[in-house]
Structure formats: structure tokens, C-alpha cells
Amino acid sequence: MPYLSLLLLFFFFSCSTNNPLRNVEEYKGPIIEIKDLNTLYSDSAQAKFKLKSEIYQVFESGEEKYPKGLNMDIFSTDNDSVSASFKANYVIKYEKENYFLATGNVVLFNYNTGDELRTEELFWYPNEEKFTSEKFVTIKTGNELHTGEGMVSNQDFSNYEILKPSGIIEVDEN
């Protein structure tokens, strides 16, 4: 008789709908995390970009994040010298759409011209080889300071346009 009551008790508790595995939350963190990333991208044996980041994360969705910032050197298309540099406090790459969104103290600098862009948000489209922003931008060129809303630039920041310029622009009358 005691075995029968134990057996009934076992069946009673084993039929419970309270499954502890059902309460486990799905993991949404990175599936890959690399510390002190230093990567060189090349195409047809020609250097394109050099990326440096304290932390690099890849998620199941394909998104890539640089939560502690990203520094990138952009190589010239005609030789292996660095023509521009880019840095930001936080960067995320949207894999499906193939663009990067950089936020927080974004700086884009061209070594050949000395021009420097500063903004709080910048989009990079590597397939189109261009940068864009819809936010307020400041561009320092020599002794001039250009400001405005929105900007479009080629990848090495040698050719750019401020979409809604503002401020004072010095004009040479000669």
C-alpha cells in the first residue's frame, strides 16, 4: 500500500504543467565577442580599411557592434597610404542593409587636405563608398569653420557637401 501511494504521488507531480524550462529567457547577447580588435580589410591584395576597437560583438541577427568605440583608417585607392581616419564612441553595423551608424563624438579627418568633420551621428555606406549625416556638422578647413545641418561625403572625405550650411564663410574677392 505505501508503494501505491508513492506511485500515485509520483504521477501526480510528474503531470505538472509547471515546467522550469519554459521560464528560461532567450539569450539576446552577442554570439561572438572579441577584445582589442585589430583587423585589416583588403580587396584584391589592396588594403581598404584598418579597424581598431576595444570590444567587437556579433549578434545572431547579424548586427555587429563596437560598444566602446571604433577607430578606422581608410586607405587611398591609388596606393597603400592612409588617406583618412574615422572614429566614434559607439558604432553598429546593420548587416542586412549593409551600413554603419556611428554616434557620439564622431570625427572624420582627411590627411591630404587637413579637413576635419565633427558631428554626433554619421552613417557609412561601404558599398557606395560614402558618409552621410542628417545632424548638425562642423567642418574645419585650414583657418575656416563651416557648420550646418546634414552632410554627404565620399569615403576619404576629400569631396563633401553640407546640405544646409550656416554661419560665416570667408570669400576671397580676387
Regions found by a protein language model. Give the residues of each.
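Mature-chain termini and adjacent capping regions
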Residues: 1-174
